[in-house]
Regions:
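Bacterial N-terminal signal peptides
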Residues: 7-16
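Active-site Gly/Thr loop motif
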Residues: 263-279, 283, 321-374
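Catalytic-site signature segments of enzymes, centered on catalytic residues
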Residues: 110-120, 183-262, 283
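Active-site-proximal alpha-helical segments within enzyme catalytic domains
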Residues: 130, 134, 221-228, 283-304, ...
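N-terminal leader/targeting segments and the immediately adjacent pre-domain N-terminus
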Residues: 18-117, 142-145, 231, 395-397
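Active-site helix/loop module of the DD-peptidase/beta-lactamase fold
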Residues: 142-181, 233-281
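Active-site-proximal loop and beta-strand segments within enzyme catalytic domains
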Residues: 34, 56, 63-95, 124, ...
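Active-site SXXK
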Residues: 44, 109, 123-148, 174, ...
Length: 397
């Protein structure tokens, strides 16, 4: 007990020392990012190496009989197989094979461990939702959205937002995945996303939930938010993201935010692609681990990069506020640590302020403000995320 307490105190003292210094922000370019020895940044090197080995060992794979004929890394096959139980499950956006398990551990802004192919641009699935909520946050900060509790419909010139059911839906509800938005986008009806297995018409029969009454993870509704944001900015969302977030944090030019083959819309007489909020039907954000780490470092500093505020602190406060119907979820895609809550995605007593951006695969950007820590982990089994985080935090001396 005493040894554990002393170790915790030492970690807190080092974290305090790190915060007392001017925060380090890497210059553009993967090679320009300064590396530091793990021990000098408060890690037990052997324990950190073991945590990294754990992440590599627990790569997401198919059952052996399927892995033998179609490796899980071939996302052009594994993604359609994952969603084959859904009606309207066919991909309509790009898919590509992924790389090997990869990741980065960053403390105090410095890289202390990296593995795999962190420079490789891969699908990131639902972490795309985190990028989307950042862009919606920019619209709110700019005053283009007056209040997140405003109804979305008056901002959008699209009849699907003006039905009796959808008209009262608010921005806040869409961001928290409690909107219950009902309709069809790009050939995908909302009822066809994640129905009960063996009962493909279950959501169609049940009908839409009342707006704000239930949390439902639904990519059609996420895509509706992306379309609404496009109507607000009246410019392609990837352009906004690049100018306002990714270029200022020094991200590479290699990331791509895809829409679908059929998601072109006309705004002010110009044809634009409405991007997707994930890779469910293909598309979404394709990005490297290094660039994901820059997003994580921006999150660690609550929207500030090297003295420049890119996104308001108020937006991060809202993003990190638990929702009424999903206490482990803030705005998309902020998964919140819930110490003491059974069944929580993360239940970490010594990192109460921790949160993560999560996508299928699993892709994870884990952020612990208490430890001045960002971890990017790609292609780890979903059931092993929490165990990896436990090992990582235990490696802090």
């Amino acid at each position: 007990m005493t040894r554990l307490l002393l170790a915790a105190c030492a970690a807190l003292m080092l974290t305090g020392a790190l915060h007392a210094q001017d925060p380090y922000f890497p210059a553009p370019g993967d090679e320009a990012w300064e590396r530091r020895d793990a021990a000098s940044m408060g890690f037990d090197p052997a324990a950190l190496e073991a945590a990294v080995a754990f992440a590599i060992e627990h790569e997401t794979r198919h059952p052996p009989e399927l892995e033998a004929v179609s490796p899980a890394r071939d996302l052009t096959v594994s993604v359609p197989l994952t969603w084959a139980f859904e009606p309207h499950s066919s991909p309509i956006g790009p898919l590509q094979a992924r790389g090997e398990p990869s990741g980065l551990i960053i403390r105090g802004g410095y890289i202390v461990a990296e593995w795999g192919e962190p420079e490789r641009v891969d699908m990131t699935f639902s972490i795309t939702k985190t990028f989307l909520s950042h862009v919606v946050g920019l619209a709110a900060d700019d005053g283009l959205i007056g209040d997140v509790h405003d109804a979305v419909a008056p901002y959008v010139d699209d009849a699907r937002f003006h039905t009796p059911h959808n008209t009262p839906i608010t921005w806040d509800q869409m961001l928290r995945q409690t909107s219950g938005w009902w309709g069809e986008l790009f050939g995908k009806p909302a009822w066809a996303d994640r129905p009960q297995r063996g009962a493909p018409a279950s959501a169609l029969i049940a009908g839409p939930p009342e707006p704000g009454s239930a949390y439902e993870y639904n990519d059609v509704r996420v895509n509706a938010l992306a379309l609404a944001a496009l109507h607000v900015f009246r410019r392609p969302l990837p352009d906004i993201l690049r100018e306002r977030i990714m270029d200022p944090v020094g991200a590479s030019p290699d990331w791509v935010w895809h829409g679908y083959d059929n998601s072109a819309v006309e705004i002010d007489g110009e044809t634009m692609i409405s991007v997707s909020g994930g890779g469910h039907w293909g598309g979404g954000m394709f990005i490297s681990a290094y660039d994901l780490a820059r997003l994580g470092l921006l999150g660690l500093h609550r929207g500030v990069w090297d003295g420049e505020r890119l996104l308001s602190d108020a937006w991060f406060e809202a993003s990190l506020t638990p929702g009424e119907h999903a206490p482990g979820y803030g705005y998309m895609n902020f998964f919140l640590n819930q110490p003491g809550m059974e069944g929580a995605v993360f239940n970490i007593e010594n990192a109460p302020g921790a949160f993560a951006y999560l996508g299928a695969g699993t892709n994870m950007v884990f952020i612990s403000p208490e430890h001045d820590l960002v971890a990017v982990v790609r292609w780890i089994e979903g059931g092993q995320r929490a165990a990896f985080v436990e090992q990582l935090l235990a490696a802090l001396e």
